[in-house]
């Protein structure tokens, strides 16, 4: 592989260091390379692999770092700093070569909520996302979104009219959660 647009850095890591400590170190290095306020330099993304213990692990670590860069850009834009272990489900989604398939899945699953042409759709997607993230805990969702409990109950009823009974159908909830994650990916 050519490195015309890549810089590969190997950093010694304490095997007992937490992933957070490693990411702080890498973020500090990226900040220095980027310069204050970017300094007019091109933006760049940084991918971090899992630690390796021998030179034999370099090819796999390189592949992990590249995957972290690729998926990190889709999720966070051109200046992403992403650890391979933080990719989660996005690691699998990135394996789907046809973005059109992902877009169709989002459109079919979210219906009119898939469009970005309305602030109301964005608001309802956010409500749905927090509901799913809190495992349909209405009180916690209302607290996180600063809604009155009854306002949230109204929104849930509206969402269920649009999407189906996601509060009682775990399979539908999984489909919607996946569609929301795909919707967040750039270029989809």
Where do the protein language model's features map onto the residues?
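Cytosolic nucleotide-utilizing catalytic cores of signal-transduction proteins
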Residues: 1-188
């Amino acid at each position: 592989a050519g490195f015309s647009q890549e810089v590969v850095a190997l950093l010694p890591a304490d095997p007992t260091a937490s992933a957070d400590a490693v990411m702080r170190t890498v973020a500090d290095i990226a900040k220095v390379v980027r310069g204050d306020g970017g300094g007019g330099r091109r933006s760049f993304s940084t991918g971090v692999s899992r630690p390796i213990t021998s030179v034999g692990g370099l090819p796999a670590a390189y592949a992990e770092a590249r995957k972290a860069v690729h998926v990190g850009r889709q999720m966070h834009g051109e200046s992403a700093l992403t650890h391979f272990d933080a990719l989660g489900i996005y690691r699998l989604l990135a394996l789907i070569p046809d973005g059109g398939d992902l877009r169709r899945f989002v459109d079919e699953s979210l219906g009119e909520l898939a469009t970005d042409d309305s602030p109301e759709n964005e608001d309802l997607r956010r409500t749905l996302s927090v509901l799913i993230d809190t495992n349909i805990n209405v009180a916690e969702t209302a607290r996180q979104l600063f809604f009155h409990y009854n306002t949230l109950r109204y929104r849930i009823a509206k969402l269920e009219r649009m999407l189906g009974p996601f509060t009682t159908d775990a399979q539908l909830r999984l489909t919607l959660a996946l569609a929301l994650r795909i919707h967040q990916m750039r270029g989809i």
